[in-house]
C-alpha cells in the first residue's frame, strides 16, 4: 500500500492522524542496536512524529487554510500546501513564502526538514519535466502524487566518506550502485549518509550532491525509494528526544524533546526500484 492510499476520501493532504498511520508500515529503522517496531510510539521518534502531524492538521484548520493552502493544478479538485504547486506569478511566490513561514513558526523555526523542504524538488519535476528526458513522465507523475497528498519526501545525496583521495568508481562497493537491470526496474545496493528525518518520511530521493566525474555507468543513478521497500535499512544516530525523556521532561528540554530531526545512514541491500520510481540511469538492459 502506498502511503497516500491511507488518505480517506478524495485526493487531498494527509491529516495528522493519517500521517501517523502511514508511518506504521514495514520500514526497517534501527537505533541503539535494536529495530524500531513503530516510530510513532518509540521514545526516540514519537514527539517529532507528533510535531509533523500537527503540521498536517494545520492544512485542514479553517483558520489557517487561507495562509497555508491553495487549489491543486493537477485537475484533482483538491487543495495542497502552497509550496507544493509550481509558482506562476510573484503573488504565488509571496504566498509560498508565507506558507513556509507559517509552518516554520509551529516549530519555532527549529525543524528544517518538514515536509515542505523537499517541495522545491517536486516543483522542479513539474515545472521542467523535459529535463529528465526519457523519465519525463515519471517526473510529471511524482509532481502530481506529492502535490495532491503532500507526501513527506526526503533526500539522501551524500556518499559515505570512505576515501576522498579515490575516484567514485574505486570505492563503488559502498556507494549506491546498480546491481542489475530488468525491464521492470533496477536493483541497487550501497549506502548514503546524512539522511536527516528519513525515519519519519514516506519517500526518499536518492541522487548526487554535486557534479562529479563518474566513469562507471552503474553509479549514475537517481531514483525515489519508498521507506518500506524491502532491503532498505536506516541506521539512526542517538536520539536527542530520547535523551531528553531519560534525563528529564519536556519542560527541562523544550526543544530537543520535541524537534529532534534524527540523522541516519541509509543502506540498500539489493533493493528493487521500479521504472516508475526512477529518474536517471545510463545502463540499459544490462546482462549481469
Which sequence ranges carry the predicted segments?
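Acidic/polar, glycine-rich intrinsically disordered N-terminal extensions of enzymes
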Residues: 1-70
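Structural beta-strand/beta-sheet cores of well-ordered domains, especially the beta-sheet scaffolds
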Residues: 27, 151-153, 184, 202-204, ...
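Internal helix-loop-helix
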Residues: 57-153, 203
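Gly/Pro-rich turn-and-neighbor structural signature
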Residues: 126-189
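A short core secondary-structure module
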Residues: 191, 195-247
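Flexible, small-/acidic-enriched active-site or ligand-binding loops
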Residues: 230-272
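Conserved small/polar residues in nucleotide/adenosyl-binding loops
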Residues: 278-284
Amino acid at each position: 500500500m502506498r502511503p497516500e492510499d491511507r488518505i480517506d476520501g478524495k485526493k487531498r493532504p494527509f491529516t495528522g492522524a493519517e500521517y501517523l498511520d502511514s508511518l506504521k508500515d514495514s520500514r526497517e529503522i534501527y537505533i541503539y542496536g535494536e529495530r524500531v517496531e513503530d516510530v510513532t510510539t518509540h521514545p526516540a521518534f514519537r514527539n517529532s512524529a507528533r510535531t509533523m502531524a500537527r503540521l498536517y492538521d494545520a492544512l485542514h484548520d479553517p483558520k489557517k487554510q487561507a495562509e497555508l493552502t491553495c487549489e491543486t493544478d493537477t485537475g484533482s479538485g483538491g487543495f495542497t500546501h502552497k509550496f507544493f504547486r509550481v509558482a506562476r506569478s510573484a503573488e504565488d511566490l509571496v504566498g509560498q513564502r508565507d506558507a513556509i513561514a507559517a509552518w516554520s513558526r509551529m516549530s519555532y523555526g527549529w525543524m528544517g526538514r518538514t515536509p515542505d523542504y523537499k517541495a522545491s524538488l517536486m516543483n522542479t519535476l513539474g515545472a521542467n519535466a523535459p529535463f529528465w528526458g526519457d523519465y519525463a513522465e515519471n517526473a510529471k507523475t511524482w509532481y502530481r502524487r506529492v502535490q495532491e497528498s503532500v507526501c513527506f519526501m526526503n533526500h539522501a545525496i551524500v556518499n559515505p566518506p570512505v576515501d576522498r583521495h579515490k575516484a567514485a568508481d574505486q570505492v563503488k562497493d559502498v556507494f549506491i550502485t546498480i546491481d542489475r537491470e530488468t525491464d521492470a526496474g533496477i536493483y541497487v545496493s550501497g549506502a548514503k549518509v546524512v539522511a536527516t528525518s528519513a525515519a519519519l518520511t514516506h519517500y526518499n530521493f536518492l541522487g548526487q550532491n554535486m557534479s562529479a566525474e563518474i566513469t562507471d555507468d552503474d553509479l549514475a543513478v537517481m531514483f525515489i525509494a519508498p521507506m518500506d521497500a524491502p532491503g532498505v535499512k536506516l541506521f539512526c544516530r542517538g536520539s536527542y528526544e530520547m535523551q531528553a525523556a531519560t534525563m528529564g521532561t519536556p519542560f527541562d528540554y523544550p526543544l530537543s524533546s520535541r524537534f529532534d530531526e534524527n540523522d541516519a545512514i541509509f543502506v540498500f541491500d539489493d533493493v528493487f526500484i521500479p521504472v516508475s520510481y526512477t529518474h536517471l540511469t545510463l545502463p540499459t538492459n544490462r546482462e549481469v
